[in-house]
Curated annotation (Swiss-Prot):
Pfam families: 2OG-FeII_Oxy_3 (PF13640), PKHD_C (PF18331)
Keywords, sorted A to Z: Dioxygenase, Iron, Metal-binding, Oxidoreductase, Vitamin C
Signal in keyword set: no
Organism: Idiomarina loihiensis (strain ATCC BAA-735 / DSM 15497 / L2-TR)
Name this polypeptide is given: PKHD-type hydroxylase IL0759
Transmembrane segments: none
């Protein structure tokens, strides 16, 4: 499942984070690329204590977003970083590493930190058997997708694009199982909102928790 959520992190929090970033702490993104991806990676990454503090605040906000948690069902965060693409910078087609810091990567995500008015280009493009799909993420918007896709970031043609990217090991390894659980959970919540703790709500809750119990990797 590929899902975009608008305003996953509130604008005030994102603006505060961005205002505190020191341009001097950005370094060549090739340093963290895999051996093949180094040839196609042309961006910058934030390093140092400010990076750790900023990413932790943003992760905390994402953990408070019920819809984000329902999509990812995170078990462990493998890696997270803030990157920057300035005019002419890009990240060519590549595959994310299957393991990072000894953690399996099931889900990749990008959280936009720049308003769309701050840059042009910089689309995140995901490739699959049906072709390509692209996204431009605004400030606070998140895109979550299974890590098994080839993807790229198109060149920024104007301005500067800031984003936080991360990789997560999910409690539910299989992406089709995660999508089923997401659909069931949204359905049982809709049933509760409409009819309270009805018989249908109880049945859906039973199905949801028994499937989660069956499929969880704990």
């Amino acid at each position: 499942m590929i899902l975009q959520i608008s305003n996953a992190v509130d604008t005030d929090t994102v603006k505060s984070i961005v205002a505190g970033l020191d341009a001097g702490q950005f370094s060549d993104g090739k340093k963290t690329a895999g051996w093949a991806a180094k040839d196609v990676k042309n961006n910058q990454q934030l390093s140092g204590k400010k990076s750790e503090a900023a990413t932790q605040v943003l992760l905390d906000r994402l953990q408070q977003n019920a819809l984000v948690q329902s999509v990812m069902r995170p078990k462990q965060v493998a890696r997270v970083t803030i990157n920057r693409y300035q005019q002419g910078e890009y990240y060519g087609t590549h595959m994310d590493d299957s393991l990072m810091n000894g953690v399996r990567t099931d889900i990749s995500f990008t959280l936009g930190l720049s308003p769309l008015s701050d840059f042009e280009g910089g689309e995140l493009v995901i490739e699959d058997a049906s072709g390509e799909r692209s996204w431009r993420l605004g400030q606070g918007d998140i895109l979550m997708y299974p890590s098994h896709y080839l993807h790229r970031v198109n060149p920024v043609t104007k301005g500067s694009r800031l984003a936080m990217i991360g990789w997560v090991q999910s409690l539910v390894k299989q992406p089709n199982y995660r999508e089923l659980l997401f659909d069931i959970e949204q359905s049982l919540k809709a049933e509760f909102d409409a009819n309270g703790k009805s018989e249908n709500f109880d049945r859906l809750t039973k199905v949801f928790h028994n499937l989660l119990r069956e499929w969880s990797d704990v």
